[in-house]
Curated annotation (Swiss-Prot):
Protein name per its UniProtKB record: Ribosome maturation factor RimP
Gene3D superfamilies per the UniProt record, alphabetical: Ribosome maturation factor RimP, C-terminal domain, RimP-like superfamily, N-terminal
Claim: Cytoplasm is one of the keywords in the record: yes
Record's keyword annotation contains Cytoplasm: yes
Disulfide bonds: none
Cross-referenced Pfam families: DUF150_C, RimP_N
Family from the record: Belongs to the RimP family.
Alphabetic keyword roster: Cytoplasm, Ribosome biogenesis
UniProt xrefs under InterPro entries: Ribosome_maturation_RimP (IPR003728), RimP_C (IPR028998), RimP_C_sf (IPR036847), RimP_N (IPR028989), RimP_N_sf (IPR035956)
Alphabetical GO biological process terms: ribosomal small subunit assembly; translation
Localization per Swiss-Prot or TrEMBL: Cytoplasm
Signal peptide range in chain numbering: none
One GO CC term on file: cytosol
Length: 171
């Protein structure tokens, strides 16, 4: 199809692939459609219990490539990349916020959000320890204060890998 926007292609790919990947035991974490170094690239980020390895990425690539070819809704030639979401995994669904409770996260809102914690000013960014998802809001501990950020106000949320903490645990 001509004239499909970048976001629309990612949404269509998600709708097409999510049920297939779930059937095979994978979670479709994110889909990116972007022009990189002059070429279109479709990135599919997957996860599963226990983590994702190179064999998983190859298997998913072999599964989804023919599905995308048959659907044939992406007009320009593109490269397909399948990978794990990485150490800074995005968090989107309510279950993501419960699954990673106890981990350090960074949350960014679409705009300033007031009243996320008693006496706190309106803010757009939070970094703290994720407590979970309750009553339509993400809860996180920021320097000892519990903040509740409405899920529909979150533009982006990611795990934050603590390199220093990991190194301390290895000593």
């Amino acid at each position: 199809m001509t004239g499909i926007g970048e976001q629309s292609i990612a949404e269509q790919v998600r709708s097409l692939l999510e049920p297939v990947l779930e059937r095979d035991g994978y979670e479709l974490v994110e889909v990116e459609w972007a022009r990189l170094a002059g070429r279109w690239t479709l990135r599919v980020f997957i996860d599963k219990a226990g983590g994702v390895g190179i064999d998983d990425c190859q298997a998913v690539s072999k599964t989804v490539e023919p599905i995308l070819d048959v659907a044939d809704f992406i007009e320009p030639a593109y490269d397909l990349e399948v990978s794990s979401p990485g150490l800074d995994r995005p968090l989107r669904k309510p279950r993501d916020f419960d699954r990673y409770a106890g981990q350090r996260v960074h949350v960014k809102a679409y705009g300033p959000v007031a009243g996320t914690a008693p006496g706190s000013p309106a803010r757009k960014h939070w970094t703290g320890v994720l407590k979970g998802f309750r009553d339509g809001a993400v809860e996180l501990d920021v320097d000892g204060a519990l903040h509740r950020v409405p899920h529909d106000q979150i533009a982006k949320a990611n795990l934050e890998y603590d390199v220093e903490g990991d190194l301390r645990r290895k000593d």
